[in-house]
Amino acid sequence: MALLQIAEPGQSAAPHQHRLAVGIDLGTTNSLVAAVRSGEARTLADAQGRHSLPSIVRYAKEGISVGQEAELHSATDAANTIVSVKRFMGRSLADIEAGSQRFPYQFSASENGLPLFNTPQGQVNPVQVSAEILRPLIARAEDTLGGSLEGAVITVPAYFDDAQRQGTKDAAQLLGVKVLRLLNEPTAAAIAYGLDSGQEGVIAVYDLGGGTFDISILRLNRGVFEVLATGGDSALGGDDFDHLLGGYLAQQWGLDLADTGLGRKLMIEARRVKEALTETDTVTATLEYQGQAYHHDIDRGTFDALIAALVKKTIAACRRALRDAGIDAGEVLETVMVGGSTRVPLVRSEVEAFFGKAPLTSIDPDRVVAIGAAIQADILVGNKPESDLLLLDVIPLSLGIETMGGLVEKIVSRNTTIPVARAQEFTTFKDGQTAMAFHVVQGERELVQDCRSLARFTLKGIPPLAAGAAHIRVTFQVDADGLLSVTAMEKSTGVKSSIQVKPSFGLSDTEIATMLKDSMKHAKEDISRRMLAEQQVEAARVLESLHSALAKDKVLLSEEELNDITAAMAELAEVAKGDDADAILAAIERLDNQTQEFAAKRMDNSIRNALKGQSVDTI
């Protein structure tokens, strides 16, 4: 494990010097920035005392506006006022145009097919729009904290892919902001509640925002969060509650929602009523429209009846996510509530009824993600108690396992920040194989012989199936202390075996540097050796499979056919001993052509045996 001390070049790290770092919740609807001050993580307000910044950017002829100012024009200048840009991150223009949702923007395609918004300020891409949202948040943080930032932790949805994550990092880098880490939003929420320290088990994060709903099922093990399943609805949120309540009020007052200007006023009043009903049982809705005043008393029961179906949809998504994760609701230790819409009493009561315990709600659900990100940022820049080392841990050399032919399959790449968990599936090589040996290695080379051996262990109790039929999931997990745990589990039976090792033990910085230099020096040679080894493994697999097939069904072949196949097998076995990968591939292809007829006969024979004794009606 590489332990990188955080300090200016030529200076020692000063434990007493507080380094400025922030956590940013770059949300679909709203964004926030938070920092740890005097030991407490808090969101930062702007000059007007507002903590939340609407994630809206307007590109007008006279300039660019962001947040509340841009929001004022979202209805009157929709074509140039970009909302929910997070939905466009990492997506191609073709994907957007193929979707069912229609947008008021004028799009063009970039050279690589990504969307460009055509605005009075010129063409801008989603990364640039996101940077404009980040800009006032960064400025707010530097003004409040009184100095330049050393970096930021930015949160992203757990389901974001590599392109979406990279786009988020690029947005920060456009502003010259160092991204300390991208943190999954549900993980940030769990960190805010301190669930990352000491507790182990399954955690659910229920995130109901203004426009989207997300449910994440996480497993926490020794400080590492593993995302087991995600789900939700990208078109369901608190705004839908407002629309239902606004429609109800319009109906009670005999108003037509199609009337110009009425819709926005109704939505504003509906939101006020919704928020008031979280604290009281009855609220009077009021509206002044076209010189007339309207009033109507609404109780919580009426509101609950209006939104009940939508809340049930979120619970159904929770049920699906648990099923995908293979978890029962009773196994969930804690449920974390995220998003302003989780303040609605019906939402909280339904979540409590489903999971069987009261959810965690003590931290403002609008701010919990930003607060968790701020805590993580504070740790990453080294703001720990004086007794602690100021360390940023990364994996200095890739971690992997040996596969057939002495090859290395890398599971965790070097320079990955820890804690981390990665998993990959493997299968058996021989028919009836009931055990599998695992060799854990470290290094950047392609062959095991050139890497560092860390540990060996064996998984026993694999069902005796045909080669390739068993599924063994291998999980590498590195905790915050650099301890590597490798677990192998056969999926159908659940039988497992594991081992722990400290990858950094006995490795000096010089040895790490030497291993990296060797990997670059021998890169071309290593690739050639890997290609040869892969062909040799494939040859062995083909021969093993054919030996098994002939042992069962050689009676299907004439003597001449059997001799031809045997000769081709002998040729492949001989060629595979050499060092010509292309020659081995050619021999495999010749043997494949030679056995086509045999494969067809075996298939016909299997079908005849399966149908033997079956009537037409049964079939």
Swiss-Prot record:
GO BP annotation list: iron-sulfur cluster assembly
Keyword ATP-binding annotated: yes
Listed Pfam families: HSP70
InterPro entries given in the database record: ATPase_NBD, Heat_shock_70_CS, HscA_NBD, HSP70_C_sf, HSP70_peptide-bd_sf, Hsp_70_fam, ISC_FeS_clus_asmbl_HscA
A Gene Ontology molecular function term of the record: ATP hydrolysis activity
Key words, A-Z: ATP-binding, Chaperone, Nucleotide-binding
Family matches, as PANTHER family: HEAT SHOCK PROTEIN 70KDA (PTHR19375)
Function: Chaperone involved in the maturation of iron-sulfur cluster-containing proteins. Has a low intrinsic ATPase activity which is markedly stimulated by HscB.
Similarity remark: Belongs to the heat shock protein 70 family.
Protein name stated in the entry: Chaperone protein HscA homolog
Organism: Shewanella amazonensis (strain ATCC BAA-1098 / SB2B)
Lineage, broadest ranks: Bacteria, Pseudomonadati, Pseudomonadota, Gammaproteobacteria, Alteromonadales
The encoding gene: hscA
